[in-house]
């Protein structure tokens, strides 16, 4: 049952945050009964009334708080932060769709690091929401994989920050695009895991975090209801970010060999999708460099290598439709056109012939 408010004061008191509780009359005069102007001036996110009550009324407000912090570049009010855990038990009643929508919106906001930091450090990310499958309610963990990065030490020779702060910087340095932001958020998700973290001669190492992280990223995104195509692309970025750095730093490395390997992996359906993936990987890797405390000038080589791989991907066919061949090839194949084109594609991929009609 919807009960309508009789007065403006009664109406605004039902709202979530003071910045959303202001009104304007027909004379375009702002009416502020909840201190919204004050909080905008001081860049503070505060609930209207008792924060524990506001969050109990609708647990989605917990996620909205994180998003508004990221959207407005505000700091959370102390009372708001203290009240959040008191409503965590209500998160289990939220639908996955509503939670995922808030996460996506948060990831696209300008001060994304601030919102993510509250989401994770408050332990809200470790809560579970729900989804109905085949008539049954299924519990869905939200983002419990992230908290172990908080305070995770990293080797000082390569990293200026701990695992979580590094991740926040990397996310912040990517464009507001979901593929890039998720790739950045999860690129080091496996660091510090028991099977990954080692201390060798007094130095931290996380060899293999890219491969395990790719598996974790895919499983996490599928669990949250993203489609396989999106999850696969983010997973591919996570899996290849360390190899990409290696190639940038080693000019003698054979990038064509790597390209052929990726083409044969079956990950991509056409050259254009592969080109897009290389550019996305380069952007995440450039942000990764910045997240290590390096200046922007250091990313020039990273982005240039990404352009190189993107251009190279257009030269190598991913599918037979990407082949540039003379019509006489079809005539020569006779009744075995499919097999003939597949063989020709493999020859081009292996560098035996060029992808031109003359060859």
Predicted features by range, described:
Residues 1-359:
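Catalytic cores of the polymerase beta-like nucleotidyltransferase superfamily
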């Amino acid at each position: 049952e919807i009960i309508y408010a009789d007065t403006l004061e009664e109406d605004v008191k039902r709202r979530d945050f003071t910045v959303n509780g202001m009104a304007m009359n027909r004379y375009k005069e702002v009416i502020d009964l909840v201190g919204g102007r004050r909080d905008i001036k001081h860049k503070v996110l505060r609930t209207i009334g008792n924060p524990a009550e506001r969050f109990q009324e609708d647990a989605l407000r917990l996620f909205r708080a994180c998003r508004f912090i990221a959207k407005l570049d505000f700091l959370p009010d102390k009372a708001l932060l203290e009240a959040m855990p008191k409503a965590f038990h209500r998160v289990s009643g939220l639908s996955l769709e509503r939670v995922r929508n808030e996460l996506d919106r948060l990831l696209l906001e300008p001060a994304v690091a601030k919102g993510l930091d509250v989401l994770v450090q408050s332990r809200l990310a470790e809560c579970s929401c729900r989804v109905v499958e085949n008539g049954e309610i299924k519990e869905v963990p939200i983002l419990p994989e992230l908290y172990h990065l908080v305070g995770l030490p990293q080797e000082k020779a390569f990293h200026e920050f701990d695992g979580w702060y590094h991740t926040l910087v990397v996310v912040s340095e990517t464009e507001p695009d979901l593929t890039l932001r998720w790739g950045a958020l999860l690129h080091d998700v496996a660091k510090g895991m028991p099977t990954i973290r080692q201390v060798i001669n007094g130095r931290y190492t996380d060899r293999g975090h890219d491969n395990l992280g790719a598996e974790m990223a895919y499983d996490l995104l599928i669990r949250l209801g993203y489609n396989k195509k999106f999850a696969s692309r983010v997973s591919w970025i996570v899996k290849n970010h360390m190899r990409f750095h290696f190639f940038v730093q080693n000019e003698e490395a054979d990038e064509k060999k790597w390209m052929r390997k990726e083409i044969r992996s079956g990950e991509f359906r056409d050259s254009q999708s592969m080109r897009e993936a290389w550019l996305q990987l380069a952007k995440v890797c450039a942000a990764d460099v910045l997240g290590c405390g390096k200046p922007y000038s250091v990313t020039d080589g990273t982005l240039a290598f990404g352009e190189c791989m993107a251009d190279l991907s257009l030269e190598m066919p991913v599918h037979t439709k990407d082949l540039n061949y003379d019509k006489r090839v079809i005539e020569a194949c006779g009744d075995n056109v499919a097999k003939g084109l597949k063989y020709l594609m493999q020859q081009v991929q292996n560098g035996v012939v060029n992808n031109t009609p003359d060859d």
